[in-house]
Amino acid sequence: MQIGPYQLKNQLIVAPMAGVTDQAFRNLCLRYGAALAVSEMLSSNPEVWDTDKSRQRMTHSGEEGIRSVQIAGADPELMAQAAQFNVEQGAHIIDINMGCPAKKVNKKLAGSALMQNPPLVKDILQAVVAAVDVPVTLKIRTGWEPEHRNGVQIAQIAEDCGIASLAVHGRTRQCMYKGNAEYDTIKAIKQNVSIPVVANGDIDSPEKARFVLDYTGVDALMIGRGAQGRPWIFREIQHYLETGNKLAPIEVAEQRQVMLEHLTKLYDLYGEYKGIRFARKHIGWYLDQEDQRQFRADFNQLETAAEQYSLVEYYFDELVQN
């Protein structure tokens, strides 16, 4: 798949997820085979660009691969300025968020709320594309609500405005993350535009990845929640797409190494206090089985990086011995 001048090495992309796809997580996913990892959403409001959270999200030092930065907002001029600012900070691709279903984003008429207003969608896309000399991509949902799936209309507007590729989550804004993603609308979008289309939603196994590619005819897949606590899913899916065979489950020693490295990267990125808190949710995703409940409870009580690191080491030492 090609996005502007950038040829992706395969069909697997990491979905942008606020509070999840920071630099530490993106680099892990890239190492395990993702072709592209999109950053966390950044507000187009310049008043928040100087906050610690925004500065961390804008940091690209040590970033591996193609740098795609997602921006969100509802004002065409501010969105254009945000795009320019992030290109100056090192973004290779600007991604526009019209897919986030969160209430705090939608109440500002941003994210997937924009799909209710096609003229404003057009104004925003035209402004951002004109403002930068890098490819601009777009992420949407299938529509605002099940009765109003206007994804094809928005996709055609995107193509007319010069959007380089389009990612579509297979639910409406109203659906949030409930129920199952549907791929009929994504298939229809692919059939009605000539720009690359990326399918997103409930792609959590190699078999599901193969099904979605075949059913929709899309150019690539975007994986979000399926990679939480499992960055190696990209390796598993790519192997299956290439060979038709499933890889053996990740070995305990490798999982231990990944988790400990992830902890270290979180502490380095956020400092000990914030790093500890981010580590709690990531470790909760890595070890999410019922028989790991006590470990999660114990881990979440720890207040130092050294204690967290040591407990993960101890957990895997016990696992190997038993």
Swiss-Prot record:
InterPro entries: Aldolase_TIM, DUS-like_FMN-bd, DUS_fam, DusB, DusB-like, tRNA-dHydroUridine_Synthase_C, tRNA_hU_synthase_CS. Gene3D superfamilies: Aldolase class I, Putative flavin oxidoreducatase, domain 2. CDD domains: DUS_like_FMN. FMN binds at residues 16-18, 70, 139, 200-202, 224-225. It catalyses: a 5,6-dihydrouridine in tRNA + NAD(+) = a uridine in tRNA + NADH + H(+); a 5,6-dihydrouridine in tRNA + NADP(+) = a uridine in tRNA + NADPH + H(+). It is an enzyme of class 1 (oxidoreductase). Coiled coil: none annotated. PANTHER family: TRNA-DIHYDROURIDINE(47) SYNTHASE [NAD(P)(+)]-LIKE. Catalyzes the synthesis of 5,6-dihydrouridine (D), a modified base found in the D-loop of most tRNAs, via the reduction of the C5-C6 double bond in target uridines. This is tRNA-dihydrouridine synthase B. The gene is dusB.
